[in-house]
Amino acid sequence: MRRLQQSLRRRSARRCPFILIPHRLLTTSYASYKPAPQATLEIEDTNSPTFLLKTSPIQLPARATSDDSAIKAHFDLPHSIFGDMVGVRREHVKGLFHYDSLTQPESLMRLTDRTLIQASAIVQRIVVAPQDPTGRELRLVVKNLDRLSDILCGVIDMCELIRNVHPHQDWVNQSDRTHQILCSFMNELNATRGLYESLAKAIAHPFNDPLTTSELRVARIFLTDFERSGIHLPPSVRERFVKHSDALLFLGRSFLSSASSGPSTVPHIEIPDPHRLLTGLGRQFVDSLPRTGRNGQAVIEPGSWEAQMILRYAREGRARELVYVGGMRADKKRISVLEAMLKERAELASVLGKNNWAEVVLVDKMTKTPENVMRFLTSLAQHHQPVARAEVDMLRRMKATALTGNYFDPRNSRTRHLPLFHAWDRDYYSDKYLTSLIPTGSPPSISPYLSTGTVMSGLSRIFSRLYGISFKPAVVSPGEVWHPSVRRLDVVHEEEGLIGVIYCDFFSRIGKSSGAAHYTVRCSRRVDDDDIDGDGLPEDWDKPYGPGLEADKESLSGKPGKYQLPIIALSMDVGTVNEGRPALLNWQELETLFHEMGHAIHSMIGRTEYHNVSGTRCATDFVELPSILMEHFVSSPEVLSTLAFHHATGEPLPIPVIEAHLALNQSLSALETHGQIAMALLDQKYHTLRHGQDSFDSTAIWFQLQQEIGVIQPVPGTAWQMQFGHLYGYGATYYSYLFDRAIAGKIWSTLFHRSGTSQAYDRKAEGILSREGGELLKEKVLKWGGGRDPWEMVGDVIGGVEGDELSKGDERALALVGSWSVV
């Protein structure tokens, strides 16, 4: 699958919003092992004795450093080397994430009670702030709202991680309970008008010490979230808002559940004369299929593995047609749920005084309005449609050759006499085309060159060269991680020292989700000026509950005050580490790891003064930018040649193999990108529905869109939109990944892609991995998190007249982004 689809399928662990809106989601291949000389490697930790690892072969490239060795050992050696886990600190038991308050599942409820008491005190303080005659409390409203957000989200976000990755059900159950209680408390805050009024007064008040630019941005984000929740509405109107919000929550979950489950499994698909129609799949496959009692028709379950194999390998188009239509057939019940959800959103938008749901959602995004999104997507569609059509015509020529036995030159532009190309032809002829690119039928495996440790040490080198940031393997205390296979990395800047912690849950285990996700455990923020005494809680109020999630206060270079450092966790499923054989990544897993590391490094560098704009807490149509840039790095042959080394021999991945894999990965990309553009346009058309449009027909809209901009015509009787699950979680913002890909491509070519610097790959990599480019990206984009207008950040990076135009964030800026190619 292509990277657009891969990234959009990743499970997104979304940031905890302070204002919890009901419709808003909180949101491996193995190769044979060849023994090599034994290595002695060290894992260093400044706070504990050094462990010596005497183990089976670890081979590194000639230029590898001791840090490379330590990182490689950290991920490539089995955890049994240390008994229970890699790098266990021999001291008393700590709690999860080194918090003393999280030593057992039951401690979550004590933490919940403690959090509710502290949060309630801050809420009361904010509500009465306007009554302070000195104005001091009003001046602290933004700071205290941010503290409140940090206290609540710190627990909610952590529980989101625990309930998704912890292997023990007691922890999962308790985290579910805590999550539910605190989210319910947030819903109560939605109705606390005093919070909204105090914030509005603080924004408008003429303080002698005015709110800073950062404070104003944080304040306006809070204000927008409040108003999106209907807090400013009259009581009778707000009752309607709550009613429609509850209905929308139910409909959204119902739609998402059905979309996630795939096509309806009944009725089954029946294929007559299977030995003839299923030619190309092999007799063993055909004989294994269940049969009906009459005429021996093969029975296929829609959406099954067998159905996928038929779409990909069955030579007879009739078999593929039966399977395609059977998997996409219109289901009136599912369609009615989708359309009810969309109509409910339109009505909710009307309650909020907006024309449509897209207006509600986009008000705080880079694009600002649905009209701007449509202009961007229309521009992309116009650019990509001819290229995508050319790729379809190439597949049509392959179909003509297969049907007639006559050779049709793929380079011939004449299409008049070519056969029609149907939706059920795409997988089959795409696979034939990709196979034709490789003389041997399949590319050499790259997995032996991509052990988890090799890749992680390579990422550390990349970040060191770009930002002066590297990874240091860290020992963990008993109880600090949720499974023995979880590795901890301390993130260290060459001048500032420790700047954050990453927990890496990469390896397979029973019951673990196969998706990839970035979880925020703790955001950065300034903590030395919290004024906790002003909350009015009595001395020793927290003794019955034990400690909270207090963090050490750290000084940051060039910033006043002290900060709590960010903690994030990355979850993937890349196989297991065994004695003598590390977990090896395939190409898709490599891309995914780089993508997630883009989010991780954004969290580490974006150490802002305020929690609510820290790291990845930024606009939906901006947050993917750092991760997409990392995809550019991994797709660069120059960079990949410095990253991939055989796990057993230390030999570099041959350049021809790199080039073959990159060429294969980028083939038919215009067709896939155009499909994503069509999906984003459909999302906008659905969410610009106005309240009262009773004639709304989601299938007709999809068919009309395909007639306008599609390159493969839709099939009568099908309703693909039933399976478009992102319509719930990404309603009106599905364009975001395409938008960020356009911006990332421009930044990549501006800062990093220096063509013609040298014929040698390693010297070209020196140019791409330039400190100058990395520092510009860090200083102008990453360090701000969500604390600065993203248009200004992008404009600063691009520079010149074009950068000045972009900084305005107006229609001209959007037109510029729309003119950039999505690569």
Curated annotation (Swiss-Prot):
Q: Which Pfam families match?
A: Peptidase_M3
How is this protein named in the record? Mitochondrial intermediate peptidase 2
What is the recorded function of this protein according to its Swiss-Prot or TrEMBL entry? Cleaves proteins, imported into the mitochondrion, to their mature size. While most mitochondrial precursor proteins are processed to the mature form in one step by mitochondrial processing peptidase (MPP), the sequential cleavage by MIP of an octapeptide after initial processing by MPP is a required step for a subgroup of nuclear-encoded precursor proteins destined for the matrix or the inner membrane.
Family, per the entry?
Belongs to the peptidase M3 family.
- Supply the PROSITE patterns for this chain: ZINC_PROTEASE (PS00142)
Q: Which positions in this protein are listed as binding Zn(2+)? A: H595, H599, H602
Q: Listed GO cellular component terms? A: mitochondrial matrix; mitochondrion
Residue numbers spanned by region Disordered? 532-553
Q: How is the cofactor bound?
A: Binds 1 zinc ion.
Report the transit peptide positions. 1-33
Q: Name one GO molecular function term.
A: metal ion binding
Q: What is its main location?
A: mitochondrion
Q: Which domain of life is it from?
A: Eukaryota
Keywords from UniProt, A to Z, are: Hydrolase, Metal-binding, Metalloprotease, Mitochondrion, Protease, Transit peptide, Zinc
Q: Enumerate the catalysed reactions.
A: Release of an N-terminal octapeptide as second stage of processing of some proteins imported into the mitochondrion
Recorded hits in InterPro entries, A to Z, give: M3A_MIP, MetalloPept_cat_dom_sf, Neurolysin/TOP_dom2, Pept_M3A_M3B, Pept_M3A_M3B_dom
Q: Which cofactor does it need?
A: Zn(2+)
Main EC class of this protein? hydrolase
